[in-house]
Amino acid sequence: TVAVGTSGVAAEQYTDFSQPELTPTIQQQNVVSAGDTHTFSVMIQNRHDGNTNMDRRLGGIATVVETHRITLGAASGVSAKFTDDGTPFEIKTGAQSIGTITAGNGKQTSLTVEVASDAEPGVYQVPVKLQYSYIQGINVDTGDYYINRDEETVTKHLNIRVEESVRLTVDTVQAEDLYKNADGTM
């Protein structure tokens, strides 16, 4: 996407050599058992290193950045979609709109999984498809400016561990002198 406008400044250029790097992580223990339904808190961090290149003066670029409320290094319009490919999980969370994540910061979202009752113990990777846009560059020339935006889709993974668990089922109970809500030995 390219935005075009007018500005009264000599040629200047901003180029961002590194796009935002989004990294999802589970914020608490990532352990579940077969048959469980669990909601995880997921932090999506923008680990953009802030490596930029400025050409000439900053004045015209600063004006464009301020006018359009641009945050350099930010991932904008971030969305996350979790999938259950190759896992014993049923993903109960739909695609989520996260918003803008500025460089060095993160935003919370959630992931709800239903674990298959016959899930084997082990560590499983849940794919997370992240879509976002970012400012790739700004060119300011006499009377004009160009904002170059790029869109990106990346797939990252969250590790979730299924622990071995014992599930007992009581089929029948026989006892004398038992009634509802009573205490006793069986």
Placement of each model-derived feature along the sequence:
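Long beta-sheet-rich domains in secretory-pathway and surface-associated proteins
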Residues: 2-186
